[in-house]
Curated annotation (Swiss-Prot):
Classification lineage: Bacteria, Bacillati, Bacillota, Bacilli, Bacillales
GO biological process: tricarboxylic acid cycle
SUPFAM superfamilies xrefs: FAD/NAD(P)-binding domain
Identification of the protein by name: Probable malate:quinone oxidoreductase
E.C. code: 1.1.5.4
Family annotation (InterPro entries): FAD/NAD-bd_sf, MQO
Signal peptide annotation: none
MF GO annotations: 2-hydroxyglutarate dehydrogenase activity; L-malate dehydrogenase (quinone) activity
Length: 509
């Protein structure tokens, strides 16, 4: 064991989009604070933030039908859609601030304009989509959305999806041009480059093995240097656990009461990626369908144009897989290691009440490539098996906890901050909508953990995020002004992404 002991203001565990965002916010709000980052892998953004491990959708509820459920009376509830959209606007404002102040360059490397389309088939689903369109059209956040059930119009919007379609079943779509494709891996790497320039100490190949509270109120971390094998002790006044699927284990090690009675259930994702450049060129949108009855919200199928390494790609999915690992680079013992006496009852209750999810996962695990092609052909009738390959995406750990609404052992499909009562440590758990709402979620961390500084920080926060504390849905003029200015700064006004020679090449990694 090394004798090295250090003390610092802030330690961030995990070099993903969440730590990158929190570190960047803190460096703007309290530049004198000393920050250290510990990351188990050799570079930033290699787990859930990596562009191959998530869908790259700028989630703004423009096309994701699971954010607008139908109420028992048949009306559409758009409250969650408004919330998700406003949270994404916060992210865009912060990124625009960073670009405008030359803290980030070349925004087209991490965000591009891309139409977002919702697609449904069948009479009931068409009726639902029309009602959704009417409900959203009255809200300024969703202006510019179009609805069509005319096959000729749909051919213009999504030629690949309409090509070879012979079914007489009713079909309809909504389209909005203000959608985005976000490369969260590229953004994470850019933010960590920025933090390095700001003097943040970033330690790769360093694994946090234990976290405990010391008698003087600091947090003591036992950190293993994976290159040398030595173990170091690092102390901090504040610790943020942003380790993706690895956060639950570290939260449990901290021993805070707020981390008790929480379990995790890992789900892995698979996508199909097109290896035929001619097919890739026929599609230019993110097209989201409707989850099948009984399927969980994370199973919504979508056909996405993506830009990875500045190259245009086409992906379809997700398909679910199962691995007991909590991280793609984790251990097969992760799930078992997370089971404690305090969360055993919660996990058992969840196992009994979530048969539909378990059945769905078993069915997904049994899918052959040809069965997956059949699902793809519901979107792309002309899809040929030889044009598509399967890639394994990231691991997601769904939170399981006891809630008033859902009772014991309820699976939470969102993102959640768990923090100590005194605000000295916080962990981020959960999955969707994840990275798109990173700035909003990290502002929540600041509010929970640094309430004594919020008044003094507020003017700077409002400079970075002009809509801070304001509902954009209720302030259409402010929304329009900020929507236009962020689009200008981030280069989102192009109808078609800037076409370079390299974009015509197909990538498949």
């Amino acid at each position: 064991m090394s004798n090295r002991q250090t003390s610092t203001d802030v330690i961030l565990i995990g070099a993903g989009i969440m730590s990158a965002t929190l570190g960047t916010l803190l460096k703007e709000l309290a530049p004198e604070w000393e920050i250290k980052v510990f990351e188990k892998l050799g570079k930033p953004g290699e787990e859930s933030s990596n562009e191959w491990n998530n869908a790259g959708t700028g989630h703004a509820a423009l096309c994701e039908l699971n954010y607008t459920p139908e109420k028992p009376d048949g009306s559409i509830d758009i409250s969650k859609a408004i919330r998700i959209n406003e949270q994404f606007q916060v992210s865009k404002q912060f990124w625009a601030y960073l670009v405008k102040n030359n803290l980030l360059q070349n925004p087209q490397e991490f965000i591009r304009p891309l139409p977002h389309i919702s697609l449904v088939q069948g009479e009931n689903n068409v009726r639902f989509l029309k009602k959704r369109f009417e409900a959203l059209s009255n809200n300024p956040l969703f202006q510019g959305m179009e609805f069509s059930d005319d096959p000729e119009k749909l051919k213009e919007w999504m030629p690949l999806i309409m090509e070879g379609r012979t079914s007489n079943e009713p079909i309809a779509a909504t389209k909005i041009d203000s959608g985005t494709d976000v490369n969260f891996g590229a953004l994470t790497r850019m933010l960590f480059d920025h933090l390095k320039r700001k003097g943040v100490e970033i330690n790769y190949k360093h694994s946090v093995k234990d976290i405990k509270r010391t008698s003087d109120g600091l947090w003591e971390l036992k950190v293993k240097d994976l290159n040398s094998g030595s173990v170091e002790i690092h102390k901090a006044k504040f610790v943020f656990i942003g380790a993706g699927g690895g956060s639950l284990h570290l939260l449990q090690k901290s021993g805070i009461p707020e981390g008790k009675h929480i379990g995790g259930f890992p789900v892995s994702g698979l996508f199909m990626v097109c290896n035929n450049p001619k097919v890739v060129e026929k599609h230019h949108a993110k097209v989201y369908g409707k989850a099948k009855i009984g399927a969980p919200p994370m199973s919504v199928p979508h056909l996405d144009t993506r830009y990875i390494d500045n190259k245009k790609m086409l992906l379809f999915g997700p398909f679910a897989g199962f691995s007991p690992k909590f991280l793609k680079n984790g251990s097969n013992m992760d799930l078992f290691a997370s089971v404690k006496l305090h969360n055993l009852g919660t996990l058992l209750a969840s196992a009994f009440k979530n048969f539909s999810l378990e059945k769905y996962l078993i069915q997904q695990l049994m899918l052959t490539k040809e069965k997956r092609m059949e699902e793809l052909r519901e979107f792309v009738p002309t899809a040929k098996s030889e044009d598509w390959d399967i890639v394994i995406a990231g691991q997601r750990v769904q939170i399981i906890k006891d809630t008033e609404a859902g009772g014991k052992g309820t699976i939470q499909f969102g993102t959640e901050v768990v923090s100590a009562a005194d605000g000295s440590i916080a962990a981020l758990l959960g999955a969707s909508p994840g990275a798109s709402t990173a700035v909003h979620v990290m502002l929540e961390v600041l509010k929970k953990c640094f309430p004594q500084h919020m008044k003094e920080w507020e003017p700077k926060i409002k400079e970075m995020i002009p809509s801070y504390g304001v509902s954009l849905a209720k302030n259409p003029d402010l929304f329009q002004k900020l929507h236009d200015s962020t689009a200008e700064t981030l280069g989102l006004n192009e109808k078609e992404p800037v076409s370079g020679a390299s974009e015509k090449e197909l990538v498949y990694s």
